[in-house]
Amino acid sequence: MVVPFFDQHWHAQSSSTLSWSLAVLLVSLAGALWTWSRTTSRAKIGAAAVSRAPACPPELLKDDLQGGVANAYTFEREITVPFDIGDTRVSKILVHPIKSCRGTSVTESRYSPEGLENDRRWCIIEAESHAIITAREVAKMVLITPHIEVDPAAPHGGRLVVSFPEDSECETFSVPLHPSQDTVSDWPVIDDCTMFGKYLVQGYVCAALEPEGRSPSEILSDYFGRSVHLVMKGPRVRPCGPTEAFPELKASAVFQDGYPFLVASEESLEEVGRVISRFAQDETPQGRIGGIDRERWRDGGVNIERFRPNIVVKGSGVPFAEDMWRQIVIRPNEPTKGSDETRTFTLVSKCTRCLLPNVDTTTGVRDAAVPYKVLMKFRTGKDPARKSKACFGCNAVVGGEGVVRVGDRIEVKEWATGIGV
């Protein structure tokens, strides 16, 4: 039986003795349930385990007790795994050729252990420090549109076309899609493209496909208002860090923040939208979120592109079901070559979120509150390694090469235990 994560809501507006008693009772019950769930989880063996989250966001309970008001938005019920995920399928595939720039929705994509084909294969760096620039710092990056044009008959197998908003007055340029070794031998090599101040990734400074005209670096520098370079990932392997669930993880990536793939579900997105809407409509002190535009977010409506996933799934009917998947097989509708091993994706950790999803992908403007501050109200404590961070989606790796298509079926091969991956 499928039991939704989020299905009970209450809102009391009185600070009377009755409300105070009710709030204290709820806290006591939540504590008892938490203790019982810990004992039950440890007693389970194998794939069948029990996962529970706090009865409601701790900070909301704290506010309730201080003000004598019961004002919890979400009451989380027990979820027993394994559960029936129904006819869950891939509903969207998103490729982001240049890190932090606009993504492209595709119906199918080849993949390798380093991610979807051409996903985050390029990035933009500071010319002097070689720090990788993201939309966390420069929100208008999301308005740069990279477009892959594949042409097997072309010298470089096609090209990456990069265009800009019309009002920027920056001209469109192209770079080789798969430059030959002879070609890149003339490109400057950067051995220390820096990510988060610790990852040093190798890359080539790209030259334009058309020799006449300005270089990609010159055009992008105009857009950014400072000296920058477009860089293509070099051959040196960039290893991924270990996770709490996989301390011996051996995986590599290109210019992704952490891991080759990000998996998320439409049900999770809908739940985030519902909670955003509830906060936007609540005008009580306990429902206040600083900077939220109540009129704009009254109906929720945040889009999945803000979270920059690669593989979006739909069908389980359970928000955040992906939190409890350890391994999934993405199986094609029609029989094709390839083994389950190359189709098995391991979800190695939850994806902790920064302010980047606050950037509107259509305007390049960062919202003051949504979704980050809302996620911080009910999605913290999910990642055992970073309990203070809010989570949405799961990072994943794969052991081989293959093709993923919209409509492919999701099968859970192994379930996570405790609080999930």
Where do the language-model regions lie?
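Metal-cofactor-dependent catalytic cores
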Residues: 2-421
